[in-house]
């Protein structure tokens, strides 16, 4: 009965909200917003001088004659009709409006562009075709977000050549660490049935600068390399190519092996291999030929195939070490098969063999840093931002700055595996900025930030890129939680330019997603910006380490983790990773080693990662660690309570469907956060 009444109440609230909009509220809706349009939520702009200026420019358009003209035209028509309520006229040459043309500035590269404006026209120039695609989306964003269009003088060149989204999608549609429904690709229907959603997905990625997509899970089902699946992959590649996006695959390293000869650990798909060999030894000539033939087959179907992303000798996945070979042997074998076609290998460094070191945080560095300079020129090491496993807070991976002769691509996690799934509103951009991109490694002295390293400013690199593990699924609004889209958007903007300001990225997402006025924008910004810090305080205080259950990475799991992965007693808490402990601090350059090694100098954000600290220790706040720890556990509840109030305060500024869905998400977050707090309180009370 209570359940029925609650459902009725929600439906009634939705109905009344809709009616209030139809009969005189501040915003009139012609369509129902579901969130499907993401940040390309083109709605009529309010009447203003800025709108009239945009109408003057947007009335006539000259296309450049690029291979992307068709999608550029479609996007401009869609955007300008909706935003300005005008239908642009496309002409061969014009002295007014928007004029696109090729220029001779080779410095713009394959994807750069220049946007300039005078009184009568806006010029968009590029050296190569893709520059017009990205420049078009930038121009639309300027109009959509209400930027002045007069006196524009913008020059954009992506800082990173490879801007990648990793989809951990299985062939059965499941998404590992996915919380927005099944995976996007309907494998069973491909290649015959092409869903419109695939094109909309490509539009979304191109609009934020993404140019590479890994289609399948790194815990790879070997069947992805079968000819039938390669034809499905080719069908997706044909769609994505229109938006300057290359496809990549994650192969199973043991794919050449006969299914009947594989280890038990790999038999969840009926055996690891799909081949005819008795070995996957990378130095075996037959294995090398198998991969060469397979790569040739792939390129016969997908001429612009990007390459392979490989998870090897990690969490049960096969790899070269199964045959007493090195990561170098495995990566280079695949790289040589791909090189004639221009493909690359992204070899993941997420390994934590306990035989390497007792401290898990030291293992990746110890396994890969000695291999610097031994990988072939088309090999990249794809490396998580931190040393543990996408924790709410952890120090930056010390491999960044320690491998001068091997390209490293950061792997960030957009999906919220340890940060509240699709339940919690947690904005990840501040985390990526503070704990990773702005971290100064001191590998070349002061100013050697991770951002400067990955963009080639600190020292040169053969390839520059960044990968993000996607949070996208078949949920109607793509990410389940409407605010999770902000993390997808922010990743794309960061991958284009890691120095882009947090304020600019955040404001643009709010404006283009919620179509709101400045006052509403400020309320939404107030909701978003503190969420990461509050989540850390409540769920992973002072970078303590894993605090959630191994089974779900969501519910409180202090009993599972305590005194196994971090230490706690009535006297103290935290793990000693100083020179007197596990000596993890020595993987950092001297400046950071000394800071992390000192209890008084160590940033409090990382205090319990590096030190076992007495509960009585005096914090910067003046409180004891015990007092501040206990107080901070409430921060999650306090934040969601504030956000519920803020969200309710702008109800009449938000469309009713998305308003109600976000409100219900906040209520769910409130319930789960209270449960987590109570579990934490119950556990730690025995030590206070």
What are these regions (language model features)?
Residues 25, 219-226, 314-316, 352-354:
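Conserved short loop/turn motifs at secondary-structure junctions
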Residues 90-93, 347-353, 522:
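Acidic carboxylate-rich catalytic motifs and surrounding loops in phosphoryl-/glycosyl-chemistry enzymes
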Residues 1-28:
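Bacterial Sec-dependent N-terminal signal peptides
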Residues 189, 261, 275-507, 513:
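Catalytic-core regions of glycoside hydrolase
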